[in-house]
A protein has these predicted regions:
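Acetyl-CoA-dependent GNAT
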Residues: 8-69, 74-75, 87, 161-165
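A short, internal acetyl-CoA/4′-phosphopantetheine-binding micro-motif in the GNAT/acyltransferase core
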Residues: 71-79, 106-108
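Conserved acetyl-CoA pyrophosphate-binding loop and the N-cap/start of the following alpha-helix
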Residues: 77, 81-89
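Conserved active-site alpha-helix within GNAT-family acetyltransferase domains
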Residues: 84, 108-126
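Conserved GNAT acetyl-CoA-binding A-motif
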Residues: 94-106
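Conserved catalytic-core motifs of GNAT/GCN5-like acyltransferases
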Residues: 105-106, 121-139
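C-terminal "cap" of GNAT-fold acetyltransferases
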Residues: 130-167
Length: 167
């Protein structure tokens, strides 16, 4: 739990850097603290030579899929490949643990991130209305075994994202 507190403080400072974009984030962390304690939700710290450059949060949602709740790279560390490298490492870890899918959502206007997902072969399969941000977000999925079972992907997306609708 000490490690979680340190990471939680780091997320608070990250939230302060994005003030206005993620004002609800530290409250969300506190509300979901139990899921961090039981291991269904994990925060990874992104490092470069021991220096924290950002964070990634994963929610192990079901036996079949994990939901990447966010990849946050400090503004002064962006556009250096940290998010992409972290995603690649997490996808390998999920595959080794026999997960089928990794889901992620991002703001529609975040074209750079959508391009990164597509370059890693995520499929943008629909949208989710984000009730806190009051806007639609893209929902993308990575099929770890490349089976391309879109019916299953859509069904799982509906379970993970209450406001999900297909493209």
């Amino acid at each position: 739990l000490k490690e979680f507190k340190r990471i939680q403080e780091g997320l608070r400072s990250l939230t302060e850097e994005f003030i206005g974009e993620y004002p609800y984030y530290s409250t969300w962390i506190q509300k979901n603290e139990a899921t961090f304690k039981d291991g269904t939700r994990v925060i990874y710290e992104l490092n470069d030579d021991g220096k924290t450059v950002g964070y990634m949060m994963i929610h192990f949602s079901t036996a079949k899929c994990a939901k990447i709740n966010g990849i946050y790279v400090f503004p002064n560390c962006q556009k250096r490949g940290y998010a992409k490298e972290a995603l690649l490492q997490v996808l390998e870890k999920l595959k080794a643990q026999k997960y089928d899918y990794a889901y992620i959502q991002t703001r529609i206007r975040n074209k750079i991130v959508v391009h990164m997902f597509e370059s890693l072969h995520f499929d943008v399969i629909g949208q989710n209305y984000h009730s806190i941000e009051k806007q639609n977000n893209w929902v993308a999925v990575y099929d770890l075994w490349h089976r391309r079972n879109f019916d299953e992907m859509f069904d799982l997306a509906k379970q993970l994202y209450p406001g999900f609708s297909k493209n």
